[in-house]
Amino acid sequence: MAVAELYTQYNRVWIPDPEEVWKSAEIAKDYRVGDKVLRLLLEDGTELDYSVNPESLPPLRNPDILVGENDLTALSYLHEPAVLHNLRIRFAESKLIYTYSGIILVAMNPYKQLPIYGDAIIHAYSGQNMGDMDPHIFAVAEEAYKQMARNNRNQSIIVSGESGAGKTVSARYAMRYFATVSKSGSNAHVEDKVLASNPITEAVGNAKTTRNDNSSRFGKYTEISFDEQNQIIGANMSTYLLEKSRVVFQSENERNYHIFYQLCASAQQSEFKHLKLGSAEEFNYTRMGGNTVIEGVNDRAEMVETQKTFTLLGFKEDFQMDVFKILAAILHLGNVQITAVGNERSSVSEDDSHLKVFCELLGLESGRVAQWLCNRKIVTSSETVVKPMTRPQAVNARDALAKKIYAHLFDFIVERINQALQFSGKQHTFIGVLDIYGFETFDVNSFEQFCINYANEKLQQQFNMHVFKLEQEEYMKEDIPWTLIDFYDNQPVIDLIEAKMGILELLDEECLLPHGTDENWLQKLYNNFVNRNPLFEKPRMSNTSFVIQHFADKVEYKCEGFLEKNRDTVYDMLVEILRASKFHLCANFFQENPTPPSPFGSMITVKSAKQVIKPNSKHFRTTVGSKFRSSLYLLMETLNATTPHYVRCIKPNDEKLPFEFDSKRIVQQLRACGVLETIRISAQSYPSRWTYIEFYSRYGILMTKQELSFSDKKEVCKVVLHRLIQDSNQYQFGKTKIFFRAGQVAYLEKLRLDKLRQSCVMVQKHMRGWLQRKKFLRERRAALIIQQYFRGQQTVRKAITAVALKEAWAAIIIQKHCRGYLVRSLYQLIRMATITMQAYSRGFLARRRYRKMLEEHKAVILQKYARAWLARRRFQSIRRFVLNIQLTYRVQRLQKKLEDQNKENHGLVEKLTSLAALRAGDVEKIQKLEAELEKAATHRRNYEEKGKRYRDAVEEKLAKLQKHNSELETQKEQIQLKLQEKTEELKEKMDNLTKQLFDDVQKEERQRMLLEKSFELKTQDYEKQIQSLKEEIKALKDEKMQLQHLVEGEHVTSDGLKAEVARLSKQVKTISEFEKEIELLQAQKIDVEKHVQSQKREMREKMSEITKQLLESYDIEDVRSRLSVEDLEHLNEDGELWFAYEGLKKATRVLESHFQSQKDCYEKEIEALNFKVVHLSQEINHLQKLFREENDINESIRHEVTRLTSENMMIPDFKQQISELEKQKQDLEIRLNEQAEKMKGKLEELSNQLHRSQEEEGTQRKALEAQNEIHTKEKEKLIDKIQEMQEASDHLKKQFETESEVKCNFRQEASRLTLENRDLEEELDMKDRVIKKLQDQVKTLSKTIGKANDVHSSSGPKEYLGMLQYKREDEAKLIQNLILDLKPRGVVVNMIPGLPAHILFMCVRYADSLNDANMLKSLMNSTINGIKQVVKEHLEDFEMLSFWLSNTCHFLNCLKQYSGEEEFMKHNSPQQNKNCLNNFDLSEYRQILSDVAIRIYHQFIIIMEKNIQPIIVPGMLEYESLQGISGLKPTGFRKRSSSIDDTDGYTMTSVLQQLSYFYTTMCQNGLDPELVRQAVKQLFFLIGAVTLNSLFLRKDMCSCRKGMQIRCNISYLEEWLKDKNLQNSLAKETLEPLSQAAWLLQVKKTTDSDAKEIYERCTSLSAVQIIKILNSYTPIDDFEKRVTPSFVRKVQALLNSREDSSQLMLDTKYLFQVTFPFTPSPHALEMIQIPSSFKLGFLNRL
C-alpha cells in the first residue's frame, strides 16, 4: 500500500501552527504523486493550499475511534501531533489527568483537588491488572506491588518532571498506596511512620519557587521494605543534591525552606520564646524573595503538623527543640551585621544582638565568632598568617557557614528518620520510589542545573534501555521475528560529563588548585571540547558560558560560581569554633570522622544488571560533584537491579490554572522527559496490537461470506489481512495478537468506513427506490380505478333499457332463492351431523365418568375396611401390652414395700422401748439447764450495769472532744486570717507555693473532721453494743417462755398423730375393696373373651363380603392398577398395609391363631393375680397389727420429741451468743488499732509535707514561721488526742477482760451441754427417720390403692412441661455437643428452625423453675461464650455463620417471647403463656445476645461480600448478556508481562447462582425472613457500588451499548428478586444509582432539553459522578457522537444547585443498620423432640 493512497478526500491531517503547535485540517481533494500542493479545509471553514513534497507529507490524523485512548502507543499514527491531541482530549475535555505511553504513566497536574485518591479508589485498583482500569498512579503502584509479590523481585517507581508538575504528590500517593494495601494488624504503625516521613522532608527540603509553591529542592529515593508476607516492615531514605544556596539566597517571589517560616509563625508561643525569633520579615534569609506568605497556607498550622509527625516518628521534644535551635541560629546568623573597615577589612560588633543569640543558641564564644567571621588563617610551611577579609568575602564566609550548618542538619534529620524507620527483621524485597528533579533550563543555569541535567541523562539512558528490553520481551513472547530498532543513545553526552578528562574531572582538578578560578576552568573546557565534541559548543557572544546538547534540548551554563559551589568549603577556624561548641548536636556536625549512618541492620545486596563504568578514583575527591557522581552511580546500580516503573509528571501551564492546556509548554516537556522517544521507538516496530477476537469483531464487516463461514477465527483473520494488506511486512501474527505497523489500523479503519459509507449509499439507494416505486404504484392504481369507474358509468348510460332492467331484476330474484335453498340444505345436513356426534360423544364421556366414579367408590370402601382392621389390631395389641406391664409392675412394688415395712417395724419397736427408758434421765437434765439459765440471767444483769458505767465514760469523753473541736475551729479561723495576710504580701511568683500550703491546711482540717466522725461512730457503736446486750438478755427470757409453750403445744401434736393413725386405719379398710376389684378383673376377663369371639365372627363375615364383591367385579391386579399414586403413598405411611391387602384371604386364619394366643395369656395372668391376692390379704392382716402397736406407743414418742427439741433450741442460742460477743470484741480491737495506725500515718504525712514545704520555701522560710508554729501546735494536739484515744482503748480492753470471764463460763457450760446433747441429737434423728419412713409407707399404700382402682382405665399420653432436666456437671457436655461440635450440614434439613436455640431455652426454663440463680447464670454465660467460640473458629464458614446467626436470633426471640412481658406475649397461645419464666429477669442477657448477633451478622455479611465481590465486575460489567451487541471497543493496550489475565470467565449466571446459594443456605438454616431481606439488600448494594465504581474507573466501559448490557443485567437481578419474593426488601432501590448510570449512557446528550432531563432523572448520582460519566463517555462506532464540552458545562451548571457529596466513589464498606425483628416461635416447647444425632441423651424431658 502506497502512502499516497491514504491522502484522499475526507481524511484529516495535522499542519504546524505557531500558537497551538499543531492544528487539524481535512483533505478537500485527493492527493496524487507529483502534486506540489495539498488542498485542505481548515476547521473554521477556510480552504488552504498547503505546499508539500513526497518526502514531507503532513502527518495523518487518527480515526475518531482511537482518539482519547488510555495508551498513546495504541494510536495508529504515532507522532507528536497525535500524542498532543490525545492528551488534550483526555485532559481538557474528559478531565482525565493520567495517560499511559507504553510503560510510562503520563501525569498532568490539574491544579485542582480531585476525588480520585480515596481509600475506595485504592481498594478498586488493588488486585487489578494494569490496563484493565483507567490509567492511575495507583495502577502503577499495584503493578509494582504485584510484580514484587509474584516474582520476588525488587521494584522501583521513578517519578520525574519539572518543578510544579506534581512529582512530590505522585510519589506520596504511591507510598500511601503501598501503606494501605500491605497494612497488617501487628505492624500498622510502621506504615504510618513511613507516610509521616513525607511532611518532615517537605518542611526541611521544599520551598516556594516561581513555578511551584511546594517545590522539592532535593532528590529523594525511598526504599520501602517488605517481609515474606509482603507487608511493610520499614523504610530507608536517600537524598541527593540539596539546594543549599536557597538558605542564603532566594530569587524574587520565592521563599526559603518552609521550616523557617513555620518557625517564625510560631515564634510567640511559649515553647519557642527562648529562640528570640520574630516574623519572617525581620530576617534576611527569609525576606529576600519579597513574599513571605503562600496563599492558602497557614504556616502556624503547618508547624503543628510538623511537630505531630516528629512525635509520630518517635522524636522526643528535646530532640525537636534542638533542631529548632539550630534553625533559629541560622536565621540569627543571617542578621549578623558585617561592616566594612576601609577597602581591605571588615568587622563584626561583639554587641550585635543577633550574634549573641546565635552564640547563645549554639554554645559558642561570641568574641571568637566575631573575629573569625572577618578574618581567615593561612597556614604555610614556615608560618601562620591571619588575613583580614573584605566585607563581601566576610558575607560569603557567613553564608557558607549557614549553608554548611543547614546541610548537616538536613542530613542529620534524614538519618534520624531512617533510624526511626529501621526494622529488626530480615528484608525480603523492597519497592523504591524515586522523586527526582526533571530536566531544567532557565535564563541563567548554574552548577545545580548542570547536576540535575546530568542525573536526567543517566536516567534517560536507563529508561531507553528498559523500553528496548520490554519491546524485545513482547516480541519473543508472541514469537514475532525480532528486528533491530534504532533508538537514541545518550552515552556520548554522559561521557562528555563524567568520562576521564570530562567536564566534572576538569572541574575537580581546578578546585584542587589554590588559585583556581571559574575562568581558567572554562578555558580548559574550550581547549578540550570546542570543535572536537559536537555536543559541546561555545556561545558566540559570551566568554563566560558554554552550551551542552542534552537529550532534551540545548542548555547554556554560566561558569560563574561553579568552583565555589563544587568546593563547598568553610574556613577552618569557623569549623574549629563550631567543633568546640557546648551544644552537643552542633559539635557533632563538624567532627572530623563522623560515624556514617547505618539505616538498616540487614540490607539486600543489589547487583547491576549491566556493568557500569565506575568513576575514576585516582585522587580522593570531596567535592560536591564527585560526591554527587558517586551517589548517582549507586542509585543507578540500585535501579538496574530492580524492575523500573516510570511516571512522567507534566505541567500543563505556567499560570497554575485548573485544566488549562498550554500546547507549547507540554510539547517542550514531552520532548524532554522521553515520552516522545517512547513513541518513536514504538512507531519503528509494531505499535498497534489487537487480539484476534477484537480484530474479528471489529472488521467482520470487511470479510466475505466465504471467509465468515470458516470456523477458525484466527485463520479467518489471517486470510482477511492477506487480502486487504498486500505488504506482509506491515503486520505480524503472534500467538494471541496481531501486530500492526504505524498507520495500518488507520488504513483498516478507512476501509471499514468506506465499506460502511458504500453500504449506507446502497441502503439509501434501495430505500429511496422502494419509496418512489411505492408512490408510483399507488398513484397508478388510483388512476386505473378512476378510469374504471368513469368508463363503466359511460357504458351503463349507453346500454340501459326497460327490458334489460326487468331481466336483470328477475335474474337477481332467481339467484336469491337458489342460493338460499343451497345454503339451507347444507346447514341442515351439518346440523344433523353435529347433533349426532354430540350425542355419541356425551354418552361416551358420561359412561367413562360413571365407571371411574364406581371404581373410586369401591377402592375407598376397600381402603376403609383394611385400614380399620389394621388400626384395631394395632390398638388391641398395644392395650394388652400396657395392661400387662402395669399389673406386673404394681404387684411387684406392693410386695417389695410390704417386706421393707415389716423389717422396719421390728426395729422401730426395739428403739421405742429404749427411748422410754432414757426419758427419766432427760427430765433431770432439763431441770439442771433451767438452773443454769437463772445464773445466766444474773450475769446479764451484771453486764447491763457495766454497760451503763461505760456509757457514762463515753459521754464524758465525747464532751471533751466537742470542747477540743471548738478550740480547733478557733485555731482554724486564726490560721485562715494569717494566710490571707501573707498572700497579700507575697509576689506573683509565689502564688503556687501559697496555694499548696493552703491546700495542706485544708487537708489537715479534713483529717480532723474525719477523726471527729470516727469518734462519733465509735460512741454510736458502743451504744449499739450495749443495746444489743440488753436485747439478748431479753431474748433469753423470751426463749424460756417459748420452751414452756412448746411443751404445751406438743400435746396438740400428739392429738394430730392420733388422727393420722385413724386415717391410716381407714386406708387399711380399703384393702378389702382392692380384693373386690380383683374379682371384677376376673369378670372382665370373661367379657373380653366373649367380645373377642364376637369380633371374630364379625371379621369373618366382613371379609367374606369384601372378597365376594372383589371377585364379582374386579380382580386384585385391576384394583392395584386403578389405585392412584397418592393412595399408594398413604398406604405406605401406615406401614405394611399393602402386604395386608394382598393377604386378605389369609386374614381369617391369622386372627384365629392370634386370639387363641391372647386367650392363653389372659388365663395365665388371672392365675397369677389369684395367687397375689391371697398373699396381699396376709400382708394386710400383718399391717393392721403393726398399726395397733404404733397407736399404743405414739403418745410416749411425742413427749420424747418435745423434750429433745426444746434442748436443741437452747444450745445453739448459747453458742451463737458467745460467738457474737467474741466477734464484737475482735472487731473493736481491730478498729482501734486501725485508727491508731491511720492517725500515726497521717501525722507522719503531715510532718513530711511540712518538711518538704520548708525545703521548697527557701527565702520565704521566715515569712512562714508563724504558720509552721501553728502546724506544730496542731500536731501536738493531735498527738494528745491520739493518746486519749489509746487510753480509751485501754479502758475498753479492761472492760472486755471482764466480759471474757463471763465468756469462759459460757464456753464451759456450752461444752458440757454439747457433750450431753450429742447423744440426744443422734437419738432424735433416728426417731425422725423412723417416723418419716412410716409416713412414706402410708403414702405409698394410699397411692397403690388409688392406682389399683384405675387398673382398667387406659393410661393417656404423658403431659410434658416444656423443660429439659440436666445436671450441673453436664453443662459442659451440653455446650460441647449442642454448640461446639454440632455440624449444621445435613442436620438442618430434618429439624425445625432454631432447634438448638429451643433446646437451650428449655434448659434455661429448667434452671428458672429451680430458682437457682447460679445455675442459670452459668448456663447463660456458657451458651454465649460457646456461640462466640464457634463463630471465632469458623469465621470463614458461611454456612456455620448463617446457622448460628439463625439460632442466636431464635434464642433471643425465645427469651423475649417467654419473658412475661405483655408486648412479647400478644401472639402466644395459653399453653405458651404458662411456659413463661417465673423467677428471673434475663433482659440483660438479651442485650448481650443482641450484641453477639450483630457481630455474627457483620462477619456473615463480610464473608458473603468476600465470596461475591470477585465475580461482580466480570459478571455485571464485562459480560455481555445481550449477544450481538458488543459493549467494548478494542483498546490495543499493551499489558506488562506480569499482567496476566486472572479472570475465570464469570458471567451474569455466576452472580445469580452465588446469590441463590446464599439465599438457599439462609432459608435452610431458618434465618428470619426479615434478616434475609436485610442481607440481600446489603448484597445488592455491594453489587451496585462495585459495578458503579468500576464503571467510573474504566473509560472503555462508558458507552451506549455497555449501558444496554448493564440495564439487561439489572433486569436479571430484579427478576431474581421477584422469583424469591423479595420485592419488599428495598434491594432494588440500592441498584438505583447503577440504573441511572446505565440510563445516562444510553440517553441522548446534545440539546438543552437533554441536559435538563439528565438533571431531573439522575437524582441518585452526585454531580461529580454525573460529570465523570459524561467526560468518560466513549463512542464505539463512528456514527456515535462524543459528548461535547459545552454540553458537559450545561449539565454542570444545572447541577451546581445541588448540595450533595463531592466523593466520586461509593463506599463499598458501608453497612446498613441491622435490626433483629421479634418473631414469636410457633412451636410448642412440649412437642419438641431431640434428635439422637445431637448426642444429648443426658437430658430428660419434664
Swiss-Prot record:
Residues 632-654 are annotated as: Actin-binding. The keyword DNA-binding does not apply. InterPro entries: Dilute_dom, IQ_motif_EF-hand-BS, Kinesin_motor_dom_sf, Myo5c_CBD, Myosin_head_motor_dom-like, Myosin_N, MYSc_Myo5, P-loop_NTPase. Expressed chiefly in non-neuronal tissues. Particularly abundant in epithelial and glandular tissues including pancreas, prostate, mammary, stomach, colon and lung. ATP binds at G161, E162, S163, G164, A165, G166, K167, T168. One of its GO terms (biological process) is actin filament organization. The modification N-acetylalanine is found at A2. Residues 1421-1697 form the Dilute domain. GO terms for molecular function: actin filament binding; ATP binding; calmodulin binding; microfilament motor activity. Residues 884-1351 form a coiled coil. This is Unconventional myosin-Vc. Pfam families: DIL (PF01843), IQ (PF00612), Myosin_head (PF00063).
